[in-house]
Amino acid sequence: MDHRLLSFISAPLPSLIASLARHGGFGAWFVGGCVRDALLARPSNDIDIVVGPGGEDLPRAVAARIGGSFFPLDEERGHARVVLKGEGASCDFAPLQGGTIAADLALRDFTINALAVSCGSDDLLDPLGGAADLAQRVIRACSAGAFAADPLRIVRAYRFAAHLDFEIHAATLALIPDHAPLLATVAGERIRDELFRMLDLPHAVPYVLKMSCAGVTGAIFGADDLPADTAAGALDRVESLCRDLSAFGTEAEPVRARLRQEVQPGITIRALAKLAAFLNGAGIPAGIASQRLMLGKAATRLLELLCSSARLTWPAPAAAPDPHALFTLFCHREPAGCEQLILPLAEGILPEDRCRHLAAYLTRQHIPRGGRLLLTGDDIMILLGLPPGRQVGEAIELLRAAQSTGEVRTRAEAQRYLAKKQLTTPEPLR
């Protein structure tokens, strides 16, 4: 047996699963991505197991032995997941399809995922030549009907190619244009998950361009005659900037950390910025993309702000930028942070020196809504003698503005500032 597979099946969790299956007297196989990644010597936190008749209780038995959490994914079809506590690893269990493991593997998307290792004999099962395709670094559909069975596999083909740095086999590529229109029938959240996983990779541009030339992105967003080169060019400029943030000077690391944050599960700000660049280049409104991809409210809002950032008239350079003007500008564009500078910088709309000034303000001075202030709401109620309500919120906003513009720098200054505002405001904070 290949030493990489031997290392995989000898690890504690696979070894336990295989032992339970052997003692239970039923067939079970490690399949798909975990076998592929083992052969590629790539780390993997997810294990997929196909279970033969009689092994229905295997997921619960595994969960009990490792102290993991059991989750039924589809009780009717017998799909279940076991999650290891504190390790981020999971095992997905599914019943055998088609009566034999060879028939089960033939129903899968690509040959590199149609690989299995038997829990009973530790043998590699490779009926479709997936190991050879791994060696040749190609993505090949398991059958001519693979895309008709699930059109999402078209997007997955490009995502796997980008993730593994593989090429899509010519015969598989030839199937894509005729099947791409079927993507209109695929649920938006399924497309979203695959698309954002690809966009979050550091070198997604060539694969997005190939998708566009094959009619895939046009089918996803309902855009005929999508300008593939223009859209890919816009994406390339932003992707390059996301890799090399030196244009942000001393703020590069805070910006990098910001781009890694998720705006909703599975969607980083970096990937959303790259999508915004592509949409602008393709002439696709952010609202249409948000609706098609079933984005949540926060991601929808941020995508709209990112798309509009390349059309915004940014403040002209000044020796001493007005902090009040900056506070007003960025308040109206919350929750966007430094990421909103990336598209205009990439398009040459925002000069690099001005970008650094704005990034410094956003990272060092501007306090977003909900950010930490010098005084809490309770502090303000005690200081001003206010009951809970609207006036406390108004006082918080006054303090946020004062801190963001540099008028207030210490707790004592904050107390004096609000006390003075209470005395001088035409409508007192009462």
Swiss-Prot record:
Domain of life where this protein originates: Bacteria
Record CDD domains: NT_ClassII-CCAase
GO molecular function: CC tRNA cytidylyltransferase activity; CCACCA tRNA nucleotidyltransferase activity; metal ion binding; nucleotide binding; tRNA binding
One Pfam family hit: PolyA_pol_RNAbd
Catalyzed reactions per annotation: a tRNA precursor + 2 CTP = a tRNA with a 3' CC end + 2 diphosphate
Keyword Endoplasmic reticulum on entry: no
Family matches, as SUPFAM superfamilies: Nucleotidyltransferase, Poly A polymerase C-terminal region-like
Keywords tagged on the record: Magnesium, Metal-binding, Nucleotide-binding, Nucleotidyltransferase, RNA-binding, Transferase, tRNA processing, tRNA-binding
Cofactor(s) demanded: Mg(2+)
Entry keyword RNA-binding: yes
Binding positions (Mg(2+)): 46, 48
UniProt xrefs under InterPro entries: NT_sf, PolA_pol_head_dom, PolyA_RNA-bd, tRNA_CCA-adding_enzyme
Amino-acid positions noted as binding CTP in the UniProt annotation, renumbered to this chain: 33-36, 108-109, 113, 150-159, 190
Any GO BP: tRNA surveillance
Family named by the database record: Belongs to the tRNA nucleotidyltransferase/poly(A) polymerase family.
This protein's name: CC-adding tRNA nucleotidyltransferase
Protein source organism: Geobacter sulfurreducens (strain ATCC 51573 / DSM 12127 / PCA)
